[in-house]
Design a protein with these regions (language model features):
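Strongly charged
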Residues: 2-33, 37, 44-156
């Protein structure tokens, strides 16, 4: 057993505009080369577009979209006796949130729109309506876990 102390959990940063602790994680994930103001502008432009399109508050639409993308199970590789099995495992809440943000950004970057704010806006709105590439990624992950349910007893 390790003699070192566990690192204390970091206090989540709260967004100054929408009072959300998920939004700064999205902004930091979008950021390239330390240009945080550019990333903030992209995200806030996308949320402003959500305000004009949606009937709810944009932060509520964003949170609902993230909840729709969050996976509940995933597969992990487990080597048993020379064979590698894809074992379905439940996903912890902080990992599911991180995966949802990652899938949202990846799906946004693959879109064909001109501006990144348009890409993120469209992907968030699609996820809010249970459509889009990020939702498809979640469904593929769940299908993979479902098809490998027989190996669930290899869980660790």
């Amino acid at each position: 057993m390790s003699r070192k102390k566990r690192a204390p959990k970091k206090i989540p940063i709260v967004d100054y505009k929408f009072k959300s602790n998920v939004l700064p994680k999205l902004i930091n994930s979008i950021m390239y080369d330390g240009k945080k103001t550019v990333a903030e502008k992209i995200v806030y432009d996308a949320l402003d577009k959500l305000k004009t399109k949606g009937k709810e508050e944009p932060i509520n639409i964003f949170n609902e979209a993230i909840n729709n993308i969050k996976p509940t199970v995933e597969v992990r590789s487990r080597r048993v006796g020379g064979a590698t099995y894809q074992v379905p495992v439940e996903v912890k809440s902080n990992r599911s949130q991180a995966l949802a943000l990652r899938w949202l950004i990846d799906a946004s970057r693959k879109r064909k729109d001109k501006k990144m704010s348009d890409k993120i806006f469209n992907e968030i709105y699609d996820a809010y309506q249970n459509k889009g590439s990020a939702i498809k990624k979640k469904e593929d992950t769940h299908k993979m876990a479902e098809s490998n349910k027989a190996f669930a007893h290899f869980r660790w």
